[in-house]
Amino acid sequence: MSMNIAIDGPAGAGKSTIAKKLAKELGFIYVDTGAMYRAMAYYVLTNGIASSDEAKIAEACQDVDVTIAYENNEQQVILNGKNINGFIRTEEVGNMASATSVYPVVRTKLVELQRKLAESTDVIMDGRDIGTCVLPNAQVKIYLTAGSKTRAQRRYDELTAKGVSCDFDEIEKDIIDRDYRDMHRETSPLKQAEDAVLVDSSEMDIDEVVEAIRSIYEEKKSC
């Protein structure tokens, strides 16, 4: 039987960074579900479809094939046969992913692939509703969070390190707005699963968070 670890939490909490490092340490496959939603959002953006046009987005779902491949132990997101890893981490794509993920047709298509992966493989998945919806039977569930200012600072530092000009207050506002949308959407809103362990990373570095989650995993595994 495969072992599944679900890591949920708001944007900018460090889910992807933590999940990747933990997966490497444990020898699990890391599945960045957010990247799959970003792939769908990238398709919507590049085809000039408005985030409010549910009918056209539903049509787009029929034309979209999102798969995951691994190259040098790094996850690659493939959209209709093209590697789009280098195009899906912008703020524009992130905001579109949040806006389009509210549509059931988008979520249905991507959740099906995510569950298929988890059935046969030891995986770590991170997202907004992994423990509550995608993998409700995951043996380990984590709700990873941090204050909005902490998350905004991390994003600001990440962007400025890449030479991208940005405004801290605008980044924090985007984060707060996305939190609200994700927590209040009708389908699978962001919330902590009843059996998830809360980990607040506001005052923790990456290694400390990884160690905390690994300890939770080892404890669950021994039960």
Named regions from a protein language model:
Residues 85-97, 101-162:
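ATP-dependent NMP and nucleoside kinases share a basic, alpha-helical "lid"
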